[in-house]
From Swiss-Prot:
It catalyses: thymidine + phosphate = 2-deoxy-alpha-D-ribose 1-phosphate + thymine. Pfam families: Glycos_trans_3N (PF02885), Glycos_transf_3 (PF00591), PYNP_C (PF07831). This is Thymidine phosphorylase. It comes from Pectobacterium atrosepticum (strain SCRI 1043 / ATCC BAA-672). Pathway: Pyrimidine metabolism; dTMP biosynthesis via salvage pathway; dTMP from thymine: step 1/2. NCBIfam families: PRK05820.1, T_phosphoryl, Y_phosphoryl. One of its GO terms (molecular function) is 1,4-alpha-oligoglucan phosphorylase activity. It is an enzyme of class 2 (transferase). The gene is deoA.
Length: 442
């Protein structure tokens, strides 16, 4: 038995907390025996004093164990349980292709996703643009979909890492969100509760990234990889570019449309293709489903070319109570905004830089995202036909096409898009889509 204030005092004085002390505190968050003030105090001491690797692992596992940890043994699955987590960005629709692609290659992907907040889109919001789709199936239904289809993308239920929900809500109002040990534990508690064999992290870098600098993104990737591997889950991370919108579109229904077109081969944005293939390749390697990066690439290309990945996506949508013919007739089902017209730059030039965060907020202004967690979303609005860095804009080539439901919304978004995109005379130096790989070995 410990005194909560003594645990806080110990960390306040820069000492190392034991696994038992951390677990006692986290269980107190779950059981409501720890007050919001005490959570805030510990969060601030961790913010200033950091945590050792042992403390970070103990915090992550205590938060994971505060609720249900999924166990798949009884299903006798004939492949690895693998997942991916992204730190979030704009036009980051990779999950919708990646899950089916990996499942088509023999993996099982029990993906528990989140909603969008601020400039970053949420995978759950994208899926909810599909009429009837159930993102909260019960446990038996979730397990059945994984067993029969190989992938399901669902929301976090109250039984998964419940201590994290309360801890995060307090961090959010006490300026302690951006603490690497706390971010690491928050992300991994939920992911490790999925009962995974392997995890791949997509840590974004650039003007639309969660972390403001490359160095901080790198630190976060290293922290997550270190803690997850020490907690018993084989994990690697890719640092990927978010200095421009990743896909050709940003907005819920628009991104779902792009995902289906990607899977069927109708249209594939090269940047989105590079990042999706890199992440899927990591997942196949981590799960022992490919012998090398080249082998992974050819297996993934095969399931795109032969239609297996698109078929798995369609089966997942149907299994989650969406339309049975969604892949064939997505345009029949996805909501469409009443107004769709291009926004042009005020002068000709080459795109030299983008404020990707501001472009994400333009989607929020249209009603396609949330400023607060309680906001409702208009799934039909957003941007598509996005210009890319290095491309020339003129009277023929717009910056984007804006999908809005009122002229006033369109006008506001047009102003925000113009302000977010810088023009010059020469193209910027091309940056890689994947900056580096972080693994336990390196």
């Amino acid at each position: 038995m410990f005194l909560i204030q003594e645990i806080i005092r110990k960390k306040r004085d820069g000492k190392t907390l034991s696994e038992e002390e951390i677990r006692f505190f986290i269980n107190g968050i779950r059981d409501n025996t720890v007050s919001e003030g005490q959570i805030a105090a510990l969060a601030m001491t961790i913010y200033f004093h950091d945590m050792s690797m042992d403390e970070r692992v103990a915090l992550t596992l205590a938060m994971r164990d505060s609720g249900t940890v999924l166990n798949w043994k009884s299903l006798n699955l004939n492949g690895p349980l693998v997942d991916k987590h992204s730190t979030g960005g704009v036009g980051d629709v990779t999950s919708l292709m990646l899950g089916p692609m990996v499942a088509a290659c023999g993996g099982y992907v029990p993906m528990i996703s989140g909603r969008g907040l601020g400039h970053t889109g949420g995978t759950l919001d994208k899926l909810e643009a599909i009429p009837g789709l159930d993102i909260f199936p019960n446990d038996d239904h979730f397990r059945r979909i994984i067993q029969q289809v190989g992938v399901a993308i669902i929301g976090q239920t109250s039984s998964l890492a419940p201590a994290d929900k309360r801890f995060y809500a307090t961090r959010d109002i006490t300026a302690t969100v951006d603490s690497i040990p706390l971010i690491t534990a928050s992300i991994l508690a939920k992911k490790l509760a999925e009962g995974l064999d392997a995890l791949v992290m997509d840590v974004k870098v650039g003007s639309g990234a969660f972390m403001p600098t490359y160095e901080l993104s790198e630190q976060l990737a290293q922290a997550i990889v270190g803690v997850a591997n020490n907690a018993g889950c084989r994990t690697s991370a890719l640092l990927t570019d978010m200095n421009q919108v990743l896909a050709s579109s940003a907005g819920n229904a628009l991104e779902v449309r792009e995902a289906v077109r990607f899977l069927t081969g109708e249209s594939r944005n090269p940047r989105l293709y590079d990042v999706t293939m890199a992440l899927c390749g990591e997942m196949l390697l981590a799960g022992g489903l490919a012998s090398s990066a080249d082998d992974a690439h050819s297996r993934l290309q095969a399931v795109l070319d032969n239609g297996k990945a698109a078929d798995v996506f369609g089966r997942m949508v149907a299994a989650q109570r969406g339309p049975g013919d969604f892949v064939e007739h997505y345009d029949r089902y996805l909501p469409v905004a009443t107004l769709s017209k291009p926004v042009f730059a005020t002068r000709e030039g080459v795109v030299t830089a983008m404020d990707t965060r501001a472009l994400g907020m333009a989607v929020v202004s249209l009603g396609g995202g949330r400023r607060q967690a309680s906001d409702t979303i208009d799934y039909s609005v957003g941007l598509d036909s996005m210009i890319s860095l290095g491309e020339r804009v003129d009277a023929q080539r717009p910056l984007a096409v804006i999908h809005a439901n009122t002229e006033a919304q369109w006008q506001q978004a047009a102003n925000e898009v113009r302000a977010a995109i810088q023009l010059g005379d020469t193209a910027p130096e091309k940056t890689p889509m994947v900056y580096r790989r972080v693994s336990a070995e390196a």
